[in-house]
Each structure stands twice: as C-alpha cells, then as structure tokens.
C-alpha cells in the first residue's frame, strides 16, 4: 500500500480540482499509458487494486510504472458524531488526479495485452480513462 513516510501536516484542506493537469500528460517511461479524462481523488487502495489487476493479466511480462502517489490525507468523523468540535481524524491517503494526467505506464508487452490490462485497471478507478501511446520522437 502506498503511504507517505512522513508529512508536515496530518490534516490538509480538500482543495479544488479545476482545470487540466499541469504536467505528466505524456507517456514518458513506457510504450503505453492510461490517461484520466475526468478529475477525482484516487485512494491508495484503488491504485493498488489497479496495479494488481494489470500485473495479474500480464502474467509477469512487461514493466509497470505508477506515476501517481497518494500524498494527501483525507479526514472523516466517526459515525454518530455531531457537527462541530474540530476536524475529523485522518482516514486515509489520496492522490488528486486532474484530467489529462497519465497515471500508469506499461512497456514490454504487445498493444493488445496493454489495452486489456488497462481496461481491467480502469474498472478499479473512479475516473474515466483512455489508452494512449508514446509519441514518436
């Protein structure tokens, strides 16, 4: 499970998810990528579920790069607690993903295998995704 080793502040503001991703919009490490077409928070468990779905389908072939990291904490109050009396306890870790961001990359497999692996991974994620290829230099 991906979690930060240490953070400066345990509780963060939620922030806004406006616009497109500033960087990381091209395939840079592998041959094929999985790009987000909508914006959302992606939890560390969703990232891990997508990674497992891809690697199991590829059967130890190829290499996978995870280009997002859950560095933002999110909080929640316990069930049945009244409003007020401070911010809730940290509940988990998320990665804010804006549209256009390439989240995963694959190399060393055929295009058909990569497409199917990304299709399976896309079902585990809360964003709409599309398959992208590396631009020819």
Curated annotation (Swiss-Prot):
Keywords: Ribonucleoprotein, Ribosomal protein, RNA-binding, rRNA-binding, tRNA-binding. One of its GO terms (molecular function) is tRNA binding. One of its GO terms (biological process) is translation. GO terms for cellular component: cytosolic large ribosomal subunit. It comes from the Bacteria. The keyword Cell membrane does not apply. The keyword Hydrolase does not apply. NCBIfam families: rplP_bact. Belongs to the universal ribosomal protein uL16 family. Part of the 50S ribosomal subunit. PANTHER family: 50S/60S RIBOSOMAL PROTEIN L16, LARGE RIBOSOMAL SUBUNIT PROTEIN UL16M. Binds 23S rRNA and is also seen to make contacts with the A and possibly P site tRNAs. This is Large ribosomal subunit protein uL16. It comes from Streptococcus uberis (strain ATCC BAA-854 / 0140J). The gene is rplP.
